[in-house]
Amino acid sequence: MRYVVSPQLVLYVEKGQKIKRVLYLTPYGVLDDKSPIYYFLSTHLKITDPEIHRRHILLTLKISQLKGYLCNLLDIRNDIIIYSHKNNLEYSYVDNTIFNPFVHTQKKTLIKSDGFLYNIYPGACDFLVIWVANADDTSIAEFGSYEDVDVNILKFETRLLEVFDNLDLDMNIESKFNNIFRTNLKFTGLRKLIKKINELNGLYYKSLLYKSDEYFINLTGNKFILTDERLNLTVWDPDGVVTFSSDGDTITINNVKLFTSLLTDIDLQMERIKGDVTYKIFLSTPITSRIKLNIETSFIFVETATNNILLSADKRISIILAKNHISIKVKNYIPNIEKYFTFLVIAINSMFNNIQQASDFTKIETVYWSRICQNTKNKHRKPVIVSSLDDNMEKVSDNFYKSSTKEVFINSSGIMFSCLDPLNKYNYVGFLSIFYRLQKMCIPCCFLKNQSHTETFSSCVHQKEITSDVINPYILNFGKVVTKSKISFLPIIFDSFFNKGVKIIFEQDNKRLKETIGYHVVKSCDEDIKRLRTISDIIMFVNEDKNILIAEDIIYFPMNYADIGTRVYILIQEIVHEVIVVKKHMTKDLIEVCPPNYKLVKNLFPRQTKFATIRSDSGMELTTDGFLVDGKEFNVDLSSNYVAFTKNITTPYTLSKYFAPLFKYVITESKNRFMKTWLINTMLRLGIDLDLDTNILPKLEKYYPNHGKSV
């Protein structure tokens, strides 16, 4: 699906809201007579020939920034008021009535806002119409203002339009809604939903209605149901993904389409408690996941410490970048906002990350060059520039020559570098692997030993490409999301646990790995990014993947000891990472990645080596070997495809009132449950049927005199 950036409309009006100018803004530079904007313009305003401008209003702007942009666009310097016929912009009323400066205004009830355009105007991605009026032409001139345009916004817009025609906006989108509402469903509503699901598509959607408390699921066997615990309805799609679940009081919705199709004859009240949407956008053309911006763009994104994660300016939208896809998490649903932010990411990637990166390193500050080569007073690791080759030097490649005492590297600009250490130690020319991996830059430094065996040397001297996923030797502190080529330490408690007695050597004054025979660290998973937001998500992931996962200071194991696999995961900012072992030899650049010693943590599993019964009741038995019903393993896949609803046994007010004096003397962990059980057993023993026998007091006085206190 190709995303089309919608046109935008700016209407500049004078007194009486008479339209003075109509500006049709589009990055395509041509009028789209099939667009909703043009339909509105031609049908409602009777205008068919607007001014066409190859411009674009960024939907990430705040209202004050938008006013500055509009003043520049219209080339005006007087106070203005901006508004819209569809949404409130700069001003609004308490009751959210649409503000219009040409309509009678209750000034005292006006509320001014400086929010972000895409939040204030939710449909802006598809249909943006902004009205601009000179403040003096309205009855509320004192509410107008003038704003200077932010030149960085204009610079960004210019560069955006320069690359726009070459952008590949083909994308496929998967979405997951995480909405929690407070509802009035209760038991009756859940029953209706079960029946609707079975009627709608019982073969494809699996549903389960069960009764539970906070500790375990209560299967009732042949005993009477005590309804003091909550019910829960869960519905799965054909892929086993939860579409929605409800306990009657609240409901969590992931599949909005299915849920709304079930509500045609159910009177449902819903109050949003929490809501967010996660989009996964698959791109047709790969992008650079490490975005680096070289102009001010805080009006669009906030850069984070992790260079493949961006936040929106209001920090309510998070964006995770990968080579072939983008993950976007939005706090509240905004139509097509995921497509718009993907468009911005693709544009920025084209604007700032396709530049030639193999620039002449000699242009970089000398001080910085000395620092990255770790040059000191007694360590001469910064190469010097020489003017010519010695006669006795032999050619190794087109850009490298050597003799028995000297090596010379020639960069793409023809500048010759050599290592002439006065202490005669650092005489070998080599290259910094980190710069080559990240930027394809061959940065010469001086080394103690010959570097011709390294992959970076082969790439810079012999033009042999190295694997793009080579691990960066710098080990990050734990806590940040780890990108594909990087590794980080484990949390202190687990670092001590996994690496007890293991030796690791770092380069002096930094955390660059120099040598280790095997050290446990954290790396990103090779698979797609996987988020686990709740404990339920964690438990489901661990049992499905059948591997160990560490989240904060808790270790999660699969239910069955025999199922535990050989991988160990760790959760960082809701994203699944992997624990691995790295090995590195001091004389080599390559970092070897090995599986973790999973047995260290597997041995912590609280397993029972002997058969034991955990709990037994009513023919059901929970044991260390599984769940048994009447002595046989219970392995039936529970489902509510076939449902039978029975009438609840209720206890009349007369009965509970009669025994109330007795219950005052009852001391038990669950008094309500004791009372219900007592009353139900009394009804059964006396054969009381409320539908047939309404006068039960004489029976109670006969068999339970003195309110049951004496028998």
Swiss-Prot record:
One example of a Gene Ontology biological process annotation: positive regulation of DNA-templated transcription
A GO molecular-function descriptor: DNA binding
Annotated keywords: Activator, DNA-binding, Transcription, Transcription regulation
Protein name per UniProt: Early transcription factor 82 kDa subunit
Residue ranges of the TM segments: none
Matches recorded under InterPro entries: Poxvirus_early-TF_lsu (IPR007532)
Subunit composition and interactions: Heterodimer of a 70 kDa and a 82 kDa subunit. Part of the early transcription complex composed of ETF, RAP94, and the DNA-directed RNA polymerase.
Task performed by this protein: Acts with RNA polymerase to initiate transcription from early gene promoters. Is recruited by the RPO-associated protein of 94 kDa (RAP94) to form the early transcription complex, which also contains the core RNA polymerase. ETF heterodimer binds to early gene promoters.
Organism per entry: Rabbit fibroma virus (strain Kasza) (RFV)
Gene that this polypeptide is encoded by: VETFL
Family label: Belongs to the poxviridae VETF large subunit family.
